Amino acid sequence: MIIEYDKKYDEQIKDSLVELQEHIQNIDLEGYNILTEEFRESYFSKTMDEIQKCNGKILLYKEENDIVGLVIGLINNDAEETYEFKAPKRGRITELIVSKNIRSNGIGTQLLNAMENYLKSIGCKDILLGAFAYNEKAIKFYEKNGYHVRMTDMTKTNL
C-alpha cells in the first residue's frame, strides 16, 4: 500500500537510494558512478534538503513493515527563475525505486500514478524526469506510461 513519508522509515529509504545507485553503478559503461562510504548519508541528506526547498513529497510503498518502493516528486520551475520566459508549473520526479526482488508487479506504476496525481492536484501542468541512458528497462517503463524524450545529455569520454 502507498503511504506518506514517515521519518521512522528513513533507514529503509536510505537503503532504497543506495540500491538504486548500486544498480546504476552496475550498468554504467563509463564507470562514473562510484559509491563512497559517505554516499548513503550524504545523498539522503541532500535529497531531503531538495524536497524541503522545492515543496516536494515522498510516497512510500509498504508491504507489512517493509518499504519496498518509493517515489520522490518536486516542484520544478527552474526555467521561470533562470530565463526571461514564463513556463508552466512543472513537477519533477527525481526518484522512482522498487526493490529489485519484486519489480514487474505493478508497484512502480502505482507509485508513478500516485505522484502524477499529487503533482496534478497542486497545479502542475507537466512532469519532468530523468532516466539513465543505460537503464533500458526504466526507459521502456516510462515510455509505456506516456513519457517521451525531450532532451538528451551527451558525453565525450577519455579526453
Q: Model-predicted segments: where are they?
A:
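A short helix-loop-beta-strand connector motif used in the catalytic cores of GNAT acetyltransferases and
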Residues: 45-60, 92
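Conserved acetyl-CoA-binding loop of GNAT-fold acetyltransferases
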Residues: 124, 143-152
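Conserved acetyl-CoA-binding loop-helix of GNAT-fold acetyltransferases
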Residues: 95-98, 104-117, 121, 140-144
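Conserved acetyl-CoA binding element of GNAT-fold acetyltransferases
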Residues: 84-100, 130, 152-155
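Conserved beta-strand-loop-alpha-helix junction that forms the acyl-donor binding cleft
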Residues: 114, 128-138, 155-159
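A short beta-loop-alpha structural element at the N-terminal edge
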Residues: 1-28
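Conserved beta-strand in the GNAT
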Residues: 60, 66-75, 92, 97
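Conserved GNAT-fold acetyl-CoA-binding loop/helix
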Residues: 22-47
